[in-house]
Amino acid sequence: MRPLTDACPKPLLTVRGKPLIVYHLEALAAAGVQDVVINTAWLEEQFPAALGDGQRWGLRLHYSMEQRDHGGALETAGGIAKALPQLAPDGVSPFWVVSGDVFLPGFDFPAAAVAAFAARARLGQLWLVPNAPHHPQGDFGLSDEGLALREAPEKLTWASVGLFRPALFADVPVGTRLALRPKLDEALAAGRLGAQRWAGAWTDVGTVERLAGLQ
Protein backbone atom coordinates (compact mmCIF):
# COMPACT_ATOMS: atom_id res chain seq x y z
CA MET A 1 0.00 0.00 0.00
CA ARG A 2 2.99 2.31 -0.14
CA PRO A 3 3.31 5.21 -0.68
CA LEU A 4 -0.16 5.79 0.84
CA THR A 5 0.73 4.05 4.09
CA ASP A 6 3.97 5.99 4.52
CA ALA A 7 1.84 8.71 6.09
CA CYS A 8 -1.40 6.92 7.06
CA PRO A 9 -2.13 3.49 8.58
CA LYS A 10 -4.27 1.29 6.34
CA PRO A 11 -7.44 1.31 8.50
CA LEU A 12 -7.53 5.10 8.28
CA LEU A 13 -7.33 5.21 4.48
CA THR A 14 -10.61 6.48 3.09
CA VAL A 15 -13.14 4.72 0.88
CA ARG A 16 -15.83 7.01 -0.53
CA GLY A 17 -14.85 9.74 1.89
CA LYS A 18 -14.81 7.61 5.05
CA PRO A 19 -11.95 5.75 6.78
CA LEU A 20 -12.13 1.98 6.35
CA ILE A 21 -12.30 1.39 10.08
CA VAL A 22 -15.27 3.74 10.46
CA TYR A 23 -17.44 1.38 8.41
CA HIS A 24 -16.75 -1.27 11.06
CA LEU A 25 -17.37 1.13 13.94
CA GLU A 26 -20.71 2.22 12.53
CA ALA A 27 -21.83 -1.38 12.00
CA LEU A 28 -20.70 -2.45 15.47
CA ALA A 29 -22.58 0.46 17.05
CA ALA A 30 -25.72 -0.41 15.07
CA ALA A 31 -25.41 -4.00 16.31
CA GLY A 32 -25.47 -2.85 19.92
CA VAL A 33 -21.78 -3.33 20.68
CA GLN A 34 -20.60 -0.83 23.27
CA ASP A 35 -16.87 -1.42 23.71
CA VAL A 36 -14.35 -1.74 20.87
CA VAL A 37 -10.64 -2.45 21.25
CA ILE A 38 -8.43 -1.18 18.43
CA ASN A 39 -5.01 -2.84 18.14
CA THR A 40 -2.46 -0.38 16.80
CA ALA A 41 1.21 -0.38 15.81
CA TRP A 42 2.20 1.48 12.62
CA LEU A 43 1.65 5.24 13.06
CA GLU A 44 -0.51 4.31 16.03
CA GLU A 45 -0.77 7.82 17.42
CA GLN A 46 -3.03 8.66 14.48
CA PHE A 47 -5.83 6.39 15.70
CA PRO A 48 -6.87 8.21 18.88
CA ALA A 49 -6.31 11.51 17.09
CA ALA A 50 -8.71 10.50 14.30
CA LEU A 51 -11.26 8.44 16.22
CA GLY A 52 -11.20 9.83 19.73
CA ASP A 53 -13.08 8.01 22.45
CA GLY A 54 -15.81 6.71 20.13
CA GLN A 55 -18.56 8.84 21.62
CA ARG A 56 -19.64 10.13 18.22
CA TRP A 57 -20.75 6.57 17.33
CA GLY A 58 -22.09 5.74 20.77
CA LEU A 59 -19.08 3.51 21.43
CA ARG A 60 -16.31 3.33 24.00
CA LEU A 61 -13.03 2.94 22.13
CA HIS A 62 -10.01 1.39 23.83
CA TYR A 63 -6.56 1.36 22.25
CA SER A 64 -4.09 -1.50 22.62
CA MET A 65 -0.86 0.17 21.53
CA GLU A 66 1.64 -2.45 20.43
CA GLN A 67 4.36 -0.10 19.19
CA ARG A 68 4.38 1.85 22.44
CA ASP A 69 4.23 -1.19 24.71
CA HIS A 70 6.24 -3.78 22.76
CA GLY A 71 8.22 -1.94 20.12
CA GLY A 72 6.21 -3.13 17.12
CA ALA A 73 3.27 -5.08 15.78
CA LEU A 74 2.46 -8.38 17.51
CA GLU A 75 0.50 -9.77 14.53
CA THR A 76 -3.09 -10.91 14.97
CA ALA A 77 -2.94 -13.63 17.63
CA GLY A 78 -0.27 -11.79 19.60
CA GLY A 79 -2.32 -8.62 19.43
CA ILE A 80 -5.46 -10.41 20.62
CA ALA A 81 -3.55 -11.96 23.52
CA LYS A 82 -2.29 -8.54 24.59
CA ALA A 83 -5.79 -7.08 24.40
CA LEU A 84 -7.61 -9.97 26.15
CA PRO A 85 -8.19 -8.08 29.42
CA GLN A 86 -10.02 -5.41 27.41
CA LEU A 87 -11.73 -7.77 24.96
CA ALA A 88 -13.08 -10.17 27.59
CA PRO A 89 -12.71 -8.75 31.11
CA ASP A 90 -14.56 -11.76 32.56
CA GLY A 91 -12.22 -14.18 30.77
CA VAL A 92 -15.02 -16.15 29.12
CA SER A 93 -17.26 -13.96 26.96
CA PRO A 94 -16.83 -14.29 23.17
CA PHE A 95 -15.79 -11.27 21.14
CA TRP A 96 -15.73 -10.14 17.53
CA VAL A 97 -12.48 -9.75 15.62
CA VAL A 98 -12.34 -7.89 12.31
CA SER A 99 -9.37 -6.68 10.33
CA GLY A 100 -9.12 -2.93 9.95
CA ASP A 101 -8.09 -3.18 6.31
CA VAL A 102 -11.01 -5.12 4.85
CA PHE A 103 -14.08 -3.51 3.31
CA LEU A 104 -17.26 -5.24 4.52
CA PRO A 105 -19.96 -2.61 4.01
CA GLY A 106 -22.94 -4.92 4.53
CA PHE A 107 -21.73 -7.01 7.45
CA ASP A 108 -23.90 -6.26 10.48
CA PHE A 109 -22.19 -8.24 13.27
CA PRO A 110 -25.43 -10.10 14.04
CA ALA A 111 -26.38 -10.59 17.68
CA ALA A 112 -27.98 -13.90 16.71
CA ALA A 113 -24.57 -15.17 15.60
CA VAL A 114 -23.09 -14.26 18.98
CA ALA A 115 -25.88 -16.11 20.80
CA ALA A 116 -25.49 -19.19 18.59
CA PHE A 117 -21.73 -19.18 19.08
CA ALA A 118 -22.04 -18.79 22.85
CA ALA A 119 -24.33 -21.84 22.98
CA ARG A 120 -21.74 -24.09 21.29
CA ALA A 121 -18.37 -25.35 22.45
CA ARG A 122 -16.50 -23.84 19.52
CA LEU A 123 -13.40 -21.73 19.99
CA GLY A 124 -13.92 -19.69 16.84
CA GLN A 125 -16.44 -18.95 14.10
CA LEU A 126 -15.24 -17.67 10.72
CA TRP A 127 -17.11 -15.98 7.89
CA LEU A 128 -15.92 -17.19 4.48
CA VAL A 129 -16.22 -15.54 1.07
CA PRO A 130 -15.58 -16.63 -2.53
CA ASN A 131 -11.92 -16.55 -3.49
CA ALA A 132 -10.64 -13.34 -5.04
CA PRO A 133 -8.37 -13.45 -8.11
CA HIS A 134 -5.34 -12.62 -5.95
CA HIS A 135 -6.06 -15.57 -3.59
CA PRO A 136 -7.51 -18.37 -5.77
CA GLN A 137 -6.45 -21.19 -3.45
CA GLY A 138 -8.68 -20.07 -0.58
CA ASP A 139 -8.14 -20.75 3.12
CA PHE A 140 -10.67 -23.25 4.45
CA GLY A 141 -13.24 -25.77 3.36
CA LEU A 142 -16.68 -25.93 4.96
CA SER A 143 -18.31 -29.11 6.25
CA ASP A 144 -22.03 -29.89 6.19
CA GLU A 145 -21.95 -29.46 9.98
CA GLY A 146 -20.63 -25.92 9.69
CA LEU A 147 -17.03 -26.65 10.65
CA ALA A 148 -13.93 -25.30 8.96
CA LEU A 149 -11.86 -27.90 7.11
CA ARG A 150 -8.17 -27.87 6.25
CA GLU A 151 -8.68 -29.95 3.10
CA ALA A 152 -11.78 -29.88 0.90
CA PRO A 153 -12.68 -30.00 -2.82
CA GLU A 154 -13.81 -26.39 -2.57
CA LYS A 155 -12.04 -23.86 -0.42
CA LEU A 156 -13.18 -20.37 0.47
CA THR A 157 -11.35 -17.32 1.78
CA TRP A 158 -11.64 -16.13 5.35
CA ALA A 159 -13.12 -12.62 5.24
CA SER A 160 -11.04 -11.53 8.26
CA VAL A 161 -14.10 -11.34 10.50
CA GLY A 162 -14.99 -13.86 13.17
CA LEU A 163 -16.05 -14.65 16.71
CA PHE A 164 -13.62 -16.08 19.24
CA ARG A 165 -13.43 -17.31 22.81
CA PRO A 166 -10.67 -16.00 25.08
CA ALA A 167 -9.59 -19.58 25.82
CA LEU A 168 -8.08 -19.87 22.33
CA PHE A 169 -5.50 -17.19 23.19
CA ALA A 170 -5.06 -17.74 26.93
CA ASP A 171 -1.77 -19.62 26.47
CA VAL A 172 -0.13 -16.88 24.37
CA PRO A 173 2.23 -14.85 26.58
CA VAL A 174 1.64 -11.12 26.41
CA GLY A 175 4.19 -9.54 24.10
CA THR A 176 4.52 -12.62 21.88
CA ARG A 177 4.55 -11.95 18.14
CA LEU A 178 2.21 -14.58 16.69
CA ALA A 179 0.08 -14.87 13.56
CA LEU A 180 -3.50 -16.07 13.84
CA ARG A 181 -3.26 -19.10 11.55
CA PRO A 182 -1.54 -21.40 14.11
CA LYS A 183 -4.34 -20.75 16.59
CA LEU A 184 -6.99 -21.34 13.92
CA ASP A 185 -5.31 -24.62 13.00
CA GLU A 186 -5.29 -25.59 16.67
CA ALA A 187 -9.04 -25.01 16.97
CA LEU A 188 -9.66 -26.76 13.64
CA ALA A 189 -7.69 -29.85 14.73
CA ALA A 190 -9.85 -30.03 17.85
CA GLY A 191 -13.05 -29.84 15.77
CA ARG A 192 -13.91 -26.51 17.39
CA LEU A 193 -13.55 -24.04 14.52
CA GLY A 194 -16.90 -23.17 12.97
CA ALA A 195 -17.42 -21.45 9.65
CA GLN A 196 -20.18 -20.08 7.47
CA ARG A 197 -20.52 -18.31 4.14
CA TRP A 198 -20.82 -14.57 3.71
CA ALA A 199 -22.48 -13.53 0.46
CA GLY A 200 -22.10 -9.78 0.80
CA ALA A 201 -19.51 -7.41 -0.61
CA TRP A 202 -15.97 -7.93 0.62
CA THR A 203 -12.59 -6.57 -0.41
CA ASP A 204 -9.16 -7.13 1.08
CA VAL A 205 -7.76 -3.64 0.64
CA GLY A 206 -4.18 -4.78 0.26
CA THR A 207 -3.05 -2.78 -2.76
CA VAL A 208 -3.39 0.74 -4.08
CA GLU A 209 -5.28 -0.67 -7.06
CA ARG A 210 -7.89 -2.43 -4.92
CA LEU A 211 -8.39 0.72 -2.87
CA ALA A 212 -8.86 2.76 -6.04
CA GLY A 213 -11.37 0.21 -7.32
CA LEU A 214 -13.62 0.88 -4.32
CA GLN A 215 -13.85 4.63 -4.83
Where are the predicted features?
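N-terminal glycine-rich phosphate-binding loop and ensuing alpha1 helix
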Residues: 1-47, 109
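Small/polar loops that bind or transfer phosphate-bearing groups
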Residues: 16, 38-40, 65, 128, ...
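Well-ordered alpha-helical segments embedded in enzymatic catalytic cores
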Residues: 20-23, 79-82, 183
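Conserved beta-loop-beta/alpha segment of the NTase-like Rossmann-fold superfamily
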Residues: 48, 54-139, 143
